[in-house]
Design a protein with these regions (language model features):
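Short, ordered loop/turn segments at secondary-structure junctions
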Residues: 75-78, 128-129, 136-140, 165, ...
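Bateman/CBS regulatory modules and CBS-like beta-alpha motifs in cytosolic regions of diverse proteins
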Residues: 24, 29-44, 48-52, 81-118, ...
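Catalytic cores of alpha/beta
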Residues: 59-61, 227-236, 283-301, 341, ...
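Active-site-adjacent beta->alpha loops and helix N-cap segments on the catalytic face
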Residues: 29-31, 77-87, 146, 190-207, ...
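Catalytic beta/alpha-barrel core
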Residues: 72-76, 101-102, 122-124, 159-161, ...
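Short beta-strand/loop segments at the ligand-binding rim of alpha/beta enzyme cores
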Residues: 43-49, 95-98, 210-219, 260-283, ...
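Glycine-rich phosphate-binding active-site loops on the catalytic face of alpha/beta enzymes
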Residues: 66-81, 238-250, 297-315, 345-378
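Alpha/beta catalytic cores of nucleotide-metabolism and tRNA/nucleoside-modifying enzymes
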Residues: 1-24, 102, 161, 171, ...
Length: 485
């Protein structure tokens, strides 16, 4: 990457402060752009779901991995819950969505409460592994909530065979004017697919481990037995290990990282597979160099740019994210490491600019919180708009969850030191209510950015990108108008 006219900025920059200049290009199609990463994680999209309790869980992890990204399970989740989640993610199908399934005697009320867990908006009625019918929200409208699903289900359903190719599945659903169908293998339900899902399976490549299973990562903090927890997570089968704290350039992190690295290396000697370590967060050269020297493969970059984070307003500490990513990526590349840009992502352009600055992948949190796949319950505001609650990982709410085993006095003391929002409404976009819808939007933007730069890969994109500086008026000029002026 270079700045337009070789200008060297005299101040630090956010994503809004910069733009990319189009260059001569031989890339004729967005689909000619390969967005696979080279940081050793194995993702085919440069998207990482942040290790936030309100964002990353089992549903999110399997859905994102199916499209090529990876989710990081938060460090606050008990290990037995993490183990169960990893097992279920690894068992999930790499192409077909996991169905929301109920028994024939399930009540309408319970079935309707389960539908928002997935974006396909239906449940499959199953008995002895075989689907009997489908229930949608329309089927349950104005029906007694204690009625049973077998009374209202649609038994005349289209069932697709696992061996069918995506195009034939799409055509079969289109002919029947359906958006959703169960997929069977030898008569047994193994998943469901939508028309969009059939299309996506021809565009995206899932992020899978050497055994062909969906990938998932997990985080550990720097307090407590980080070494022991890291070993447990590795044995569970995670695909990237994140060592995470808000201030990554501190002695405790630099003491913990070598311990985690040693556990990882011993695991690699035993299994033949070297799991990448990501650590952070930092915002400059010195922090990046120290983390790489201590044993990380990937440096997480960002202090305070996230929507749920109040660090900059509370402390004055942080750095505009574009400049932080640019400097850290330069230092990491010189040391043979990589960076993830963590925070401040609000539009597809921000993802593209982070990659142009040298990030291998981009971490997204709050933007993905407002989707069906995030862990929270779907709620409805007074205006009728559906939303999910989100909160920061240094907020009083997160601290309370993290310190549940401490005494009441200690928990009250720690709650005084919060840096994050404890409750924020993240509204579902009516046009993009599922995380896959957002992934479609992001990848379309990033692929198009690469074609403007004449790049076929992320590495070429970083090499060829030409970045200019703009005023706030310049940024506003590029915003679309949804009504006339």
């Amino acid at each position: 990457m270079r700045f337009l006219n070789d200008l060297q900025p005299s101040f630090d920059l956010t994503y809004n402060d910069v733009f990319m200049v189009p260059a001569r290009s031989s890339v004729t199609s967005r689909l000619d752009v390969n967005l696979s990463t080279n940081d050793g994680v194995g993702t085919t999209l440069p998207l990482v779901v942040s290790n936030m309790t309100a964002v990353s869980g089992r549903r999110m992890a399997e859905t994102v991995a199916r499209r090529g990204g990876i989710a990081i399970l938060p460090q606050d989740i008990p290990l037995d819950i993490v183990r169960s989640a990893v097992e279920r993610i690894k068992a999930a199908h790499t192409v077909y969505d996991t169905p929301v399934s109920v028994s024939p005697s399930t009540t309408i009320g319970e079935a309707l409460s389960l539908m928002p867990k997935r974006s396909h908006g239906a449940v499959v009625v199953v008995e002895n592994g075989k689907p009997l019918g489908i229930v949608t929200s329309r089927d349950g409208a104005e029906i007694d909530r204690f009625a049973q699903v077998h009374e209202v289900m649609s038994g005349d359903m289209l069932a697709l065979n696992a061996g069918d190719d995506p195009q034939s599945m799409f055509n079969a659903m289109t002919e029947r004017h359906l958006d959703f169908a169960p997929v069977l293998d030898d008569g047994k339900l193994i998943g469901v697919i939508t028309r969009k899902g059939a299309l996506r399976s021809t565009i995206y490549q899932p992020a899978v481990d050497p055994d062909g299973r969906l990938e998932v990562g997990a985080a550990v903090g720097i307090n407590g037995d980080a070494r022991g927890k890291a070993g447990e997570l590795l044995r569970m089968g995670i695909d990237v290990l994140v060592v995470d704290t808000a201030h990554g350039h501190q002695e405790k992190m630099l003491e913990t990282l070598p311990l985690v690295r040693d556990v990882r290396d011993a695991f690699a000697d035993d299994t033949g597979r070297r799991i990448p370590i990501a650590a952070g967060n930092v915002v400059g050269t010195a922090g990046t160099q120290d983390l790489v020297a201590a044993g990380t493969d990937i440096v997480k970059v960002g202090v305070g740019p996230g929507a749920m984070c109040t660090t900059r307003m509370m402390t004055g500490v942080g750095r505009p994210q574009f400049s932080a990513v640019l400097e850290c990526a330069t230092a990491a590349h010189e040391a043979g490491a990589h960076v993830w840009a963590d925070g401040g992502i609000r539009y597809p352009r921000d993802v593209a600019l982070a990659l142009a600055a040298g990030a291998t992948s981009v971490m997204i949190g709050s933007w993905f919180a407002g989707t069906h796949e995030s862990p929270g319950d779907l709620q409805t505001g007074a205006d009728g708009r559906p939303y999910k609650e989100s909160f920061g990982m240094a907020s009083a709410r997160a601290i309370s969850n993290r310190t549940r085993d401490a005494t009441g006095f200690e928990r009250a003391r720690m709650a005084l030191f919060q840096e994050g929002i404890s409750s924020s409404r993240m509204y579902l976009d009516p046009d993009r209510p599922g995380v896959e819808d957002l992934i479609d939007t992001i990848t379309a933007g990033v692929r198009s950015s690469a074609t403007y730069a004449g790049a076929h890969t992320i590495a070429e994109f970083h090499e060829r990108a030409i970045i200019g500086l703009q005023s706030s008026a310049g940024y506003d000029e590029g915003r679309p108008l949804h009504a006339s002026w």
